[in-house]
C-alpha cells in the first residue's frame, strides 16, 4: 500500500493529556489551518472530560433523555460519549488526490484493530458500519470498542477516533451510541479482564496510525457479516 498523505515528512504526534472538547475543537481548526498553509500533518492524542457530542446525522430520540447537554459537531456519524479512560485521536492530515475518505477511515480502523490484537483482543469490522468491534458470541451481541467520525475540508481531515480503554461504560446508557440499537459498547478493560489505561495504549496507537496512513500497515480483511 502507498501513503494516503500528501506530505512525505513524518506525522507530528502531540500528547495533550486531558483537554475539554471545545478547546480541542479550536486546536483542531488551528492545526488544520496550519496544515493547509504548509505545516506538518499532526496527530493529537488526548482524553476529554465527560461530554456527549453529536454528529450531523444524530436524531432527536438518540440524545440523552435526561436533558444532559450535548455538543453539536460537524463530523460525520451520530451521538457518542467522550470521557476519562478513553483515548481520543484527532489526525489532522493532508490527503492525496483524488480524495478517498473511505480508505482513510479503513486505515484508522486497521490501526485500532492492530493495537487491540497486540493487547490480546480480537476485533473486527462490521459490514456497513464504521468503527472497531468485538464480535458477537453466544451470550452477547457485537460490542463497539472503537468509534470513528471524521470530516474532510480543504483536503485536510478533522475529528477522528476514540478507543475505549478503561472508561465508565455506564455513560453510554443515556444515549443511543452512534445511533445503533442492536449492539453494545465495551472497553479494553472489560474485555481483557485487567485494567488497560490510556497511557498503556497511546504510543501503540500513535505508531499504528502512522504506519496505516503511510501504507506500512496494510488494510486487512476483518469483516463480520452482522452484529447479532
Swiss-Prot record:
Gene name linked to the record: lipB
Protein name from the UniProt record: Octanoyltransferase
Subcellular location: Cytoplasm
E.C. number(s) listed in UniProt: 2.3.1.181
Family: Belongs to the LipB family.
InterPro entries xrefs: aa-tRNA-synth_II/BPL/LPL, BPL_LPL_catalytic, Octanoyltransferase, Octanoyltransferase_CS
PANTHER family with a match to the protein in the record: LIPOYLTRANSFERASE 2, MITOCHONDRIAL-RELATED, OCTANOYLTRANSFERASE
Domain BPL/LPL catalytic span(s) in chain numbering: 37-217
Keywords noted in UniProt: Acyltransferase, Cytoplasm, Transferase
Source species of the chain: Mycolicibacterium smegmatis (strain ATCC 700084 / mc(2)155) (Mycobacterium smegmatis)
Amino acid at each position: 500500500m502507498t501513503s494516503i498523505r500528501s506530505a512525505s515528512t513524518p506525522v507530528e504526534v502531540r500528547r495533550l493529556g486531558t483537554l475539554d472538547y471545545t478547546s480541542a475543537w479550536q486546536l483542531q481548526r488551528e492545526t488544520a489551518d496550519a496544515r493547509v498553509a504548509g505545516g506538518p500533518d499532526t496527530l493529537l492524542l488526548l482524553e476529554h472530560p465527560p461530554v456527549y457530542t453529536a454528529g450531523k446525522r444524530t436524531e432527536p430520540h438518540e440524545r440523552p433523555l435526561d436533558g444532559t447537554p450535548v455538543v453539536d459537531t460537524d463530523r460525520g456519524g451520530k451521538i457518542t460519549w467522550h470521557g476519562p479512560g478513553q483515548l481520543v485521536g484527532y489526525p489532522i492530515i493532508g490527503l492525496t488526490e483524488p480524495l478517498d475518505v473511505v480508505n482513510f477511515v479503513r486505515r484508522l480502523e486497521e490501526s485500532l484493530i492492530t493495537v487491540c490484537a497486540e493487547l490480546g483482543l480480537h476485533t473486527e469490522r462490521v459490514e456497513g458500519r464504521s468503527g472497531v468491534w468485538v464480535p458477537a458470541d453466544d451470550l452477547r451481541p457485537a460490542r463497539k470498542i472503537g468509534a470513528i467520525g471524521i470530516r474532510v475540508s480543504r483536503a485536510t481531515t478533522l475529528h477522528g477516533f476514540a478507543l475505549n480503554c478503561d472508561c465508565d461504560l455506564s455513560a453510554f446508557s443515556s444515549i443511543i451510541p452512534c445511533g445503533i440499537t442492536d449492539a453494545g459498547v465495551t472497553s479494553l478493560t472489560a474485555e481483557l479482564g485487567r485494567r488497560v489505561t490510556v497511557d498503556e495504549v497511546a504510543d501503540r496507537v500513535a505508531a499504528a496510525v502512522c504506519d496505516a496512513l503511510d501504507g506500512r500497515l496494510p488494510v486487512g480483511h476483518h469483516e463480520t457479516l452482522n452484529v447479532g
